[in-house]
UniProtKB/Swiss-Prot annotation:
It catalyses: S-ubiquitinyl-[E2 ubiquitin-conjugating enzyme]-L-cysteine + [acceptor protein]-L-lysine = [E2 ubiquitin-conjugating enzyme]-L-cysteine + N(6)-ubiquitinyl-[acceptor protein]-L-lysine. Residues 55-75 are annotated as: U-box-like. Its EC number is 2.3.2.27. This is Nitric oxide synthase-interacting protein. It is found in: Cytoplasm; Nucleus. The modification Phosphoserine is found at residues 36, 107. Interacts with NOS1 and NOS3. Interacts with PP2A holoenzyme, containing PPP2CA, PPP2CB, PPP2R1A and PPP2R2A subunits. GO terms for biological process: negative regulation of catalytic activity; negative regulation of nitric-oxide synthase activity; nitric oxide metabolic process; regulation of nitric oxide biosynthetic process. The lineage of its organism: Eukaryota, Metazoa, Chordata, Craniata, Vertebrata. Expressed in heart, brain and lung. Present in endothelial cells (at protein level).
């Protein structure tokens, strides 16, 4: 309620609209927004460049990428992993040298203490007729017992004086974790290899129109079997052997009966039918999540 008094016609009630506006301006709390059609990509656009694909490939999870964009992403991730691994190995070697130096210093302190004790030993003649020798103990050998009185001031907790140069806390380097060598998909987060990418061949609506002319149209491609137009409102699937794009209705009614690729004639398995991830139409009934969240720090009392 930091800006309640600064709003126009401020009243005694903190309204929902004021709360949402203050949350957006404060920088705290999780923000939710409902995505509109303008924020949803088309089904034939790359998930990285958000532009219509010229040489599309699809992952086993159904995410469509431009071949050049995804290969550049994989190459960049491999370089980043190599850089992180080099920094990790360097820090690991530095820590190993520090541990060896500490062990060497501890060993030297142990030897130095032993030599000091050896040089401080004084041999005294023992009189066998004294009571000390008969008892086998000396007053110097008696160890003090545990104290039952109040604790002394010397044993009180000593807080470090950080303003003294000798007691200034030392800033230590952040410990690096061993990076994973696996390249992950930028959308699903699952492991991704170049061999997992399947080429996709869209069937254009009009084969006489070039690629530039197709981009300006709202309906650009059709199903390779039924010739139905493809859009974000039409669930699609990619057949792995041929790379053809067909509708899910065609898959359920025609292809699953014989499990044969209608383009190449190859046998199909469930793994060969890749459901294409589409952006949706902007309506809630499209079956696509249209709610975006941004997590920010939470201010608690």
């Amino acid at each position: 309620m930091t800006r309640h008094g600064k709003n126009c016609t401020a009243g005694a009630v903190y309204t929902y609209h004021e709360k949402k506006k203050d949350t957006a301006a404060s920088g705290y709390g999780t923000q939710n927004i409902r995505l509109s059609r303008d924020a949803v990509k088309d089904f034939d656009c790359c998930c990285l460049s958000l532009q219509p694909c010229h040489d599309p490939v699809v992952t086993p999870d159904g995410y469509l990428y431009e071949r050049e964009a995804i290969l550049e992403y994989i190459l960049h991730q491999k370089k980043e992993i190599a850089r992180q691994m080099k920094a990790y190995e360097k820090q690991r070697g530095t820590r190993r040298e520090e541990q060896k130096e500490l062990q060497r210093a501890a060993s030297q302190d142990h030897v130095r203490g032993f030599l000091e004790k050896e040089s401080a030993i004084v041999s005294r003649p023992l009189n066998p007729f004294t009571a000390k020798a008969l008892s086998g103990t000396s007053p110097d050998d008696v160890q003090p017992g545990p104290s039952v009185g109040p604790p002394s001031k010397d044993k009180d907790k000593v807080l470090p004086s950080f303003w003294i140069p000798s007691l200034t806390p030392e800033a230590k380097a952040t410990k690096l974790e061993k990076p994973s060598r696996t390249v992950t998909c930028p959308m699903s987060g699952k492991p991704l290899r170049m061999s997992d990418l399947t080429p996709v061949h869209f069937t254009p609506l009009d084969s006489s129109v070039d690629r530039v002319g197709l981009i300006t149209r709202s309906e650009r491609y059709v199903c390779a079997v039924t010739r139905d137009s493809l859009s974000n409102a039409t669930p699609c699937a990619v057949l792995r052997p041929s790379g053809a794009v067909v509708t899910l209705e065609c898959v359920e009614k025609l292809i699953r009966k014989d499990m044969v690729d209608p383009v190449t004639g190859d046998k199909l398995t469930d793994r060969d039918i890749i459901v294409l991830q589409r952006g949706g139409t902007g309506f809630a009934g499209s079956g696509v999540k249209l709610q975006a969240e941004k997590s920010r720090p939470v201010m608690q009392a």
